[in-house]
C-alpha cells in the first residue's frame, strides 16, 4: 500500500487541475490565436505563473484501493494485483478468467 501522503498529494493535484482547467485552456487558445510575438510572450508568461500542479501532465494514475502507481488498469481504476483478487472473488461484473 502506498503512503497516505502520496495518495493525498495526488488527490490535491487532481483538484488543482480541475480548478485551473478552464483558465489554462483559455490561455493556450489565446497563445495560438496571438498575432505578435510580444503578445505570445506575455500570454506564455501568464501561463507559467499558474501553479505547476495545475497541469494535467503531472497527474499519475493510482489504484483506488492501494494507491499503487504501477500496473494500473484504466478500465477499472485498479492495479493488477487488486484486479486479479477482485476478479477471483467475482466482485467485478462481467470479468471472467479466460480458459483455452
From Swiss-Prot:
Pfam families: Ribosomal_S14. InterPro entries: Ribosomal_uS14 (IPR001209), Ribosomal_uS14_bac/plastid (IPR023036), Ribosomal_uS14_CS (IPR018271). Its main location: plastid. GO terms for molecular function: rRNA binding; structural constituent of ribosome. It comes from the Eukaryota. GO terms for cellular component: chloroplast; small ribosomal subunit. The keyword Chloroplast applies. It is found in: Plastid, Chloroplast. The keyword Ligase does not apply. Keywords: Chloroplast, Plastid, Ribonucleoprotein, Ribosomal protein, RNA-binding, rRNA-binding. Part of the 30S ribosomal subunit. Belongs to the universal ribosomal protein uS14 family. This is Small ribosomal subunit protein uS14c.
Amino acid at each position: 500500500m502506498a503512503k497516505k501522503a502520496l495518495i493525498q498529494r495526488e488527490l490535491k493535484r487532481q483538484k488543482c487541475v480541475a480548478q485551473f482547467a478552464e483558465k489554462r485552456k483559455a490561455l493556450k487558445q489565446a497563445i495560438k490565436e496571438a498575432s505578435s510575438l510580444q503578445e505570445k510572450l506575455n500570454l506564455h508568461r501568464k501561463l507559467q505563473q499558474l501553479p505547476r500542479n495545475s497541469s494535467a501532465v503531472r497527474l499519475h494514475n493510482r489504484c483506488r484501493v492501494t494507491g499503487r502507481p504501477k500496473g494500473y488498469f484504466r478500465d477499472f481504476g485498479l492495479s493488477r494485483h487488486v484486479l486479479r483478487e477482485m476478479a477471483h472473488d467475482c466482485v467485478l461484473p462481467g470479468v471472467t478468467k479466460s480458459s483455452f
